[in-house]
Regions:
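Alpha-helix initiation/capping motif
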Residues: 1, 70, 130-134
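Anionic group-transfer/hydrolysis microenvironments
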Residues: 1-2, 123
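Active-site HxH/HxHxD metal-binding segment of metal-dependent hydrolases
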Residues: 3-88, 92, 173-184
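Metallo-beta-lactamase
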Residues: 62-63, 86, 92-98, 103-202
Length: 203
């Protein structure tokens, strides 16, 4: 939860939902800035991200002040997550996959039977996560996508941290940053089509 805590709490009430856990993909303000406040209001456990994102969680108050979000606070997860861990929601299990690059401790959640992934800011429909923030690493991001996401299967549908859903197969065919033809060209010394050209709206 990046913020707008009152709206989120109202939505829970409106739809008669019970919040069981808070899952964090990475420590950036727009994904974790409201975590401490929701934890305070509900008492539910915080799971994730990977410990390598402690740096970003510690930066949340400063980042919040910079962007005019006064109640953005740092927090300590009840459970740090690592590659190969499993998280549960009711009786449903999701696999945790550590996918550094956008941030060093970014994780994604994968439901193997449903062919579904929540990928945070690793991958978007037609784009990829930024790596120009502190401790971002462009090559790590490309490796996370090509070596960790693609092997899960082209039929996997994913929800990104921003923008519409897509599938891994669609992105392998047409994403201008990580399509098979692009990564193949880059490996052969072709043009670098990523880097600073990543759309600024994806943070």
């Amino acid at each position: 939860p990046g913020g707008e805590v009152p709206m989120l709490m109202q939505a829970l009430k409106q739809y008669d939902l019970t919040l069981e856990k808070i899952w964090i993909t990475h420590g950036h303000l727009d994904h974790a800035g409201g975590t401490a406040a929701i934890k305070e209001l509900t008492g539910v456990p915080i799971e994730g991200p990977h410990p390598d994102d402690q740096f970003w969680i510690d930066q949340i108050p400063e980042s919040g002040a910079r962007y005019g979000i006064p109640d953005a606070r740092s927090f300590t997860p009840d459970r740090w997550l690592g590659d190969g861990d499993v998280v549960t929601l009711g009786e449903t299990q999701f696999e945790v996959i550590h996918c550094p690059g956008h941030t060093p401790g970014h994780v994604i959640f994968f439901h193997r039977e449903a062919r579904f992934a929540q990928v945070g800011d690793v991958l978007f429909k037609g784009s990829i996560g930024r790596t120009d923030f502190p401790r971002g690493n462009h090559q790590q991001l490309l490796d996370s996508i090509s070596l960790k996401l693609w092997p899960l299967g082209e039929d996997v549908a994913f929800v990104p941290g921003h923008g519409p859903m897509s599938t891994f197969g669609a992105e392998r065919r047409s994403n201008p940053f990580v399509a098979d033809v692009v990564l193949g060209a880059g490996a052969d010394g072709g043009p670098d089509l990523a880097g600073d050209t990543v759309p600024m709206r994806y943070i």
